[in-house]
Structure formats: C-alpha cells, structure tokens
Amino acid sequence: MAKWNVLIATMLVCNGAVAQDSLKNLPELGMPLTDRKLVVAHCMTNIIRFKGHKFEDSCNPDYFSPQGNITAAIGGLTQVLPMEDTLLRGASLDSTVAFELRAARASGIDAFQFYYPLHTDAWDEIIEAYFRVSDALHIPFSFTFCISHPSGGTQDYRVGEFARRINRIMDDVGRNNPRWLRTPDGRLIVYLWSGAGLADIPAGAPSPAFCVARAFKQLADQVHERFACIYDINEQITPAKLNDFLDYFPACWIWTLPYHEGYIGNMVAATCAERHRTFTGSAFCDFYTSKLLAKGTWNIYSAEGAAEAGLEKSDRKYIVTGLSYNFRKLLEFGISRDVPLINIITWNDYPEGHHLAPEINHNEGFSILLNYYKSVWKKEPSPYGNRDVAVTFFKQYAHTTVPKPYNFALVPVERGIDPASEDSVEVVTLLRKPAIVTIHGHSVSAPAGLGVTRVFQAEGPVSVSVSRDHVDVLRFRTPAAITLHPLRTNRLTYSYSSEHEAFFTPLVGNQPLWPLP
C-alpha cells in the first residue's frame, strides 16, 4: 500500500510539473501588448453620480461641510467635492458617462481599466454604458477589466462568478467590439489589482505565480478568450518574486509607489527588459485618504461609523508626493523607458485622493501636465505650443502646522520624499519663450518649454503672473488660499492654472462649478 501511495504522489507531482511547464515562458509572453502608445486610467466603476445613484460616503459631498451634517463632530468626513455631484446629480447614467468620457479625453486618457471585484453585479450596467455612450458619441476610448482583490470561497467559485458576469457583458456589448483593449494578436488585456487572490495557492507552493497564472487561464477559458494579464506590484518586490511572476505573465504595472532615488521601477524595468516582458509606466498625482479608516487598518468607516468613532479611533493614510514632483518624475521615468502604456492611478478614486477627474482640489492642474508629457512621450507637438501656460500646486497649510480642532492622525504608507518639500508654492510653466514668473511678488526667470519654480508658502490666495518685457502674458489668482490656522486635517494637493476656463468651458459651459474648498 505504501508503494502505491508513493506512486500516486509521484504522479501528482509530475502532472503538476507538466502543467506548470505548459504555462511557463510561453512565446506569447514576449509579444507586444500594443501597437500604439496609450494612457490607461484605473477607473473606480461605482464612483459615479447620476439620478438615484449617490457617491459612496467617503466622497459624498453631503459630508463635505464641517457643519450641518452627521459628521460635523469630526469636522466633516470628506475633503473632496467632485464636479459631477454639482452638475449631474439629476442626470441619467448615460449623460454622466458622456461627461466622464469627455473629461477623461480632455485630460489625456485613452482607456479605462475598470475596478472589478466580486459581488458587484449592479456595476455591470455602468460598464456597459461606457461602451454604449462612447459608441453613440464617437468618442475614441478603450475598456477592459481590472480583476480586484478577489476573496471568499474556492478558486472554482471565484473564477465562475467572474466568468458569469464577464460573459454577460461581452455578449451584451459584443465580443468583437473594437473598444475592447486588446493586443495586436487579439488577446484581451486584463489588469490585476491584488489579483492573486483569484487562485487557491497551497501553503509552500514552489511557484505562487504559477498558481495565479493557472487561475487566470481558467478564467480566460471560461470566457472563451485569451488573456494578456498585467500583474500588479504594490510592494518593494524582490527580484526573485518578480522573476517568478515574469515566468508566467507578459507584463506588470506598479501601483502607488512614489518616485525617489531608490525607486523600485528601476529594478522592475531592467528585469522586464532582460526577460523580454513589457514594463508599463505608472503615475499617481496625490495620495491622501478622504475616506476615514479605523485606526491601524484599511477598514473604511461609513459616515455614521466615522462620526461614532471620532478622532481617537480613526486615521487617514498619506503619501508625500512633493506637490507635482512625484507625478512629473513618474511620467518622465516612463518616457525614458519608452513604455507602450502609461497607467494613471487613478481617474476617479476620490476617497484615496489620487484622482484626475474634475474635483474642487485638483481642478485641471494634473491633467495639463499629463497632456504635455503625453505629447513628449508620443513625439507629437505640445497641445500648449501656441500659448504660455502656468499651473500652480500647493498644500493649504505647512506640514508642521497642527489643525484645530479636527486633527486626524496621519499614517504614511510609503516613504521617500521629504515632507518639507510640500511647504512651498510650486508653479510649473510651459512657455513659448523665456519669461519672468512672479509668485506672491517673488520674480524669477523661467526657461522656454517646461520649467518649475518654487517659493515659500505665504498666507492667502496664490497670485501668479508671467511677463516678458514688463508686460504680463498671463495672470491668475487661485480661488483657494493657504492658511496658518487650518480647521481640519487636509493634505490634498490643490492645483489651479491659467487654463482653467479653457479646460472647463467645453465640458460645462458657463455653469458655476463649486464653492471654495
């Protein structure tokens, strides 16, 4: 009997090795992901405002004010105020989707990868609306799924649930719909975000990456597709772990790891090049959780839960981004590697503060930068080549200032950029010719093309002007102001630019946008 047990165990190991070898280093893993450069943004599928569908509590403007709502005891739950809520709370789903698509295109985005967790069937109609509206309005845009933190049940259950929903969407919008984000050889590009949970990974498995690849192959088979999966990196990954996943995956993308001298992207990009895998660029503009979390966890409070927990049992997560520094450097890093895809983190995750979508703090500033860098990356003329542009970025108080009375614990989730770098006013200029930039009365010379100028913070609104030969070519003053006495914790970056009206008028006309932050 013992001999039979040994024989059976040997057969199982051999069969596993054969299966593993059948997925390892497949020729298609070294094939191109795309034949054109694209900006792909992570889209939080359910964070959208239309009639009968509110924003989740962590970005719901009902809890923006520090008074007059159930979260007044903590000075207001949220610090974000999306433009959509001001304009589209009574609109149809299709009308809101049309606004989202136009705003994304104006921001330089070509495609969405939809945040896609289990047990969110109601979201599928939103995804289908994007296909429907982009087609009806002839808006060039591509779409795909981002399989996100699956958990619960067995691998067969998780795969089956995703397959059921994906099949329904693909059948409804058309499997051959040209808006699906595909490789030149026809594979469906699928993103992972904490996606390894799709697989059952036995304790001590010699290759967790094989288990994950096998699970995604099972999902691809059940939706009658071939996948090109982009593996997610949200840690200081080791070369050994990275190589294990590159044995089975054609590409990877990095989540919110900030740029600094030891940026993990250097190792990841070099390893991908050695392995003939695709390194895709990533950039995020900010990171501060308007959502309130149970202290020491990532558990999100509802508005009622936040009010009940109060300041002592809550915290907010934060990554120092150096105003626009991190966003610019990550874009420059991707351009220097001539990546085929640049991933924007994110389009509309207002609760984590890394959104490009129009909102009271970020406005259009980061979108202006993305449009400029996109033209450099694609070796095309700058969209601002015929005029002078200035964009300012600042925090609304210095990092050493203590808000009163609503001071939340701030927990840094990544390090690398000096917090003091955010105690300034930064102005990024895109100039036709050299000029003088004046900020708060401090004047400095700025070069043609892209330039960055910083001055110390000063209380009040930020005034910016650009002049040549003592004549102003542009001038603006920010609606928001720097304060010495903040009421509540808020480390969101504020941005505003000389392009404010030119950016928003095609989107909203002359409608009032929002109050002051």
Model-based region annotation:
Residues M1-S22:
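Bacterial Sec-dependent N-terminal signal peptides
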Residues Q20-D423, P434-L450, Q457-D472, F476-P517:
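Glycan-processing catalytic domains of CAZymes
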Residues T429-K433:
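Non-cytosolic beta-sheet module surface loops
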